[in-house]
Amino acid sequence: MALNPLEQFKIHTIVELPKLFGHDINFTNSSLFMMISVVSVILFLLLGVRKGAVIPGYLQAAVEYVYDFITSIIESNTGSKGLKHIPLVFTVFTFTLSCNLVGMLPYSFTVTSHVIVTFALSMIVFTYTTIVGFKEKGINFLRILLPEGIPSWLAPMMVFIKLFAYLARPISLSIRLAANMIAGHTIIKVVAGFIMNMHLILTPIPFLFIIALIGFEVFVAILQAYIFTILTCIYLSDAVK
């Protein structure tokens, strides 16, 4: 792992399980850290709301802040119509954020560095918003493919472009998140490996540089969860507005 910065993204089997319809369903390091991420969110929420005090403590205040934060994002993008979809957006944000931050721990595994995970999450968002769109607007939901004011001669090309862009949403959403996680962790690993090989880890400037890189990657982890959530709300706004 010290020589190969991409080794940290390799999936390893922890518990081998019988195949299901010819497919491997082994319990891997990805499965483990995904479970850790989910349990972390559940514990954060349960411990935060267990007392329900009028004057909240630090943990309850944190839970309330996250909830208010998600509510404000939904309202600013979809209006009051989108508030009933808080469970989806809240789950997307907390799960993505938890996976990103857990991946920053030493000897951990970054679940969101794998496109298959981010694509599955993106497909949930894509499918949900599409169903909501047809449920709210019926066949009129297809009007998002043809903006108002487009000349009739340009309409077929515009419909094709908009349809392609719409179907590409889960792909772009998933690749954006995974690519940022891979890039950040790889840079940290490469720089840290170089510094250690040069025996500079105990000198002040390289040590502080590594700390700064880690701090920046934590910021990126939070930012990417935020961007993923914002885009989810934007897609939701097409369905409910």
From Swiss-Prot:
CDD domains: ATP-synt_Fo_a_6. PROSITE patterns: ATPASE_A (PS00449). It is a multi-pass membrane protein. GO terms for molecular function: proton-transporting ATP synthase activity, rotational mechanism. One of its GO terms (cellular component) is proton-transporting ATP synthase complex. Keywords: ATP synthesis, Cell membrane, CF(0), Hydrogen ion transport, Ion transport, Membrane, Transmembrane, Transmembrane helix, Transport. Its main location: membrane. The chain crosses the membrane at residues 29-49, 86-106, 114-134, 144-164, 177-197, 200-220, 221-241. It comes from the Bacteria. It is found in: Cell membrane. It holds the Pfam family ATP-synt_A. InterPro entries: ATP_synth_F0_asu, ATP_synth_F0_asu_AS, ATP_synth_F0_asu_bact/mt, F0_ATP_A_sf. Key component of the proton channel; it plays a direct role in the translocation of protons across the membrane. F-type ATPases have 2 components, CF(1) - the catalytic core - and CF(0) - the membrane proton channel. CF(1) has five subunits: alpha(3), beta(3), gamma(1), delta(1), epsilon(1). CF(0) has three main subunits: a(1), b(2) and c(9-12). The alpha and beta chains form an alternating ring which encloses part of the gamma chain. CF(1) is attached to CF(0) by a central stalk formed by the gamma and epsilon chains, while a peripheral stalk is formed by the delta and b chains. Belongs to the ATPase A chain family. This is ATP synthase subunit a. It comes from Wolbachia sp. subsp. Brugia malayi (strain TRS).
